[in-house]
């Protein structure tokens, strides 16, 4: 049903204030509003250039954040020339972070005000209603430091610069901590409990980076973002403009059935998983980098990554291909490269075949390099979280060798001691090397390690959409290959022992490919002509040679598994 248009009244261009919770979205006709009226949460039409033809298309997009365009450093002469020019208009000074409706989140981008089409209709955000239970819980929590969120408008009082908003959030966090400290209560760090709803799309849980949950800078200067506490979606939208410094810190829970833990209790209670968070607001951050330059490749980033704040508005971040250090300009990178002596990842080379090598890196021994790797991978993994240290993880980096050194293609990480026998915590092929078969090579290598351990392994669940497609394609390829080579009867257990796949993954793959058939009261695995033809039509890819792998499973001491202290 098409959304209905509300009658116009005073207060909001083209309509009355904000619609009630039971009403449809309020829509203002084109030409009845200006850029100064657009707030976070509105849905407007935006010009988007077509990748192939370059022509401008009109796409409906939701406004997630508003900011002033970053001002470049100017010489005195340039400042004098700029002073003689007329003042820039609102369209030229503001940028809008938009999410294109019905498109993937990785297409979100900053657009200038000139690309917003005010001649088309504008859909206003719905009003969020706070229940009586939530209000009473806020009062009991004594969190007087938190204030109702104010719509983020370019000209209104609710619009603040990034620096001012960050300071206010830090002050609010400190005030909340002081209030609870005076009342003799320990300030809890919120951890959303598992709700059992596995339908929420989440990526492969990622390995972690050193971070206290207080939003302070770590020793490398990387700002660690805090979880946004509270269940108000409007607050999440309003605060998204300054998400590079984390969400609003509070010590209350908006949902009754969720527990809260202090950091110490959290570390004791939770297993050392890669993600360590189930917060929905974790994926609501605004992308802070546009592009990264790594070696010969210039890559557009997909998601937010908590690099230092001073790098948030630069056009391109330059990354050393060997040590993964980051720099704001090509000059500083060139100066670093003249001193950087690293030619390969700082670990043990456990595999070498042709021009491909794998290095094993202990997060406890190479913290700086692993943290830089986590920051880089966060640019391309939506649900990857950087909360705890890298100590409990091993990193297996795939590189391509040439005369200049070893160039990173991708990596996967795994816990040193996984309670659920996960053999992968986070896996990534760098975008500039995707669609070349390296993803399956990483997956195959992880299962070769699992075979040496004598276990059945599986990636950490739930998988992302792309991760599920990659793993399902690999599982199908290996299972079909094994069945075609086997002439005798074979069971699910025998397939698991030969491939190191878990029984659940084998059954999932067989059901997805419609390979399970019932015959005379028994389930049979049947390969259809379509499945066989697809398998034979695939082009050959690089494979792992087990004879070139020199690695033994390790038994970790408890002191080597401690982290977060």
UniProtKB/Swiss-Prot annotation:
GO molecular function: chromatin binding; histone acetyltransferase activity; histone crotonyltransferase activity; histone H4 acetyltransferase activity; peptide 2-hydroxyisobutyryltransferase activity; transcription coregulator activity; zinc ion binding
Annotated positions of the N6-acetyllysine modification: 384
GO cellular component: chromatin; NuA4 histone acetyltransferase complex; nucleosome; nucleus; piccolo histone acetyltransferase complex
Enzyme Commission number(s) of this protein: 2.3.1.48, 2.3.1.-
Ranges for region Disordered: 1-33, 173-217
PANTHER family: HISTONE ACETYLTRANSFERASE, HISTONE ACETYLTRANSFERASE ESA1
Entry domain remark: The ESA1-RPD3 motif is common to ESA1 and RPD3 and is required for ESA1 histone acetyl-transferase (HAT) activity and RPD3 histone deacetylase (HDAC) activity.
Entry protein name: Histone acetyltransferase ESA1
Organism: Mycosarcoma maydis
Organism phylogeny: Eukaryota, Fungi, Dikarya, Basidiomycota, Ustilaginomycotina
Gene: ESA1
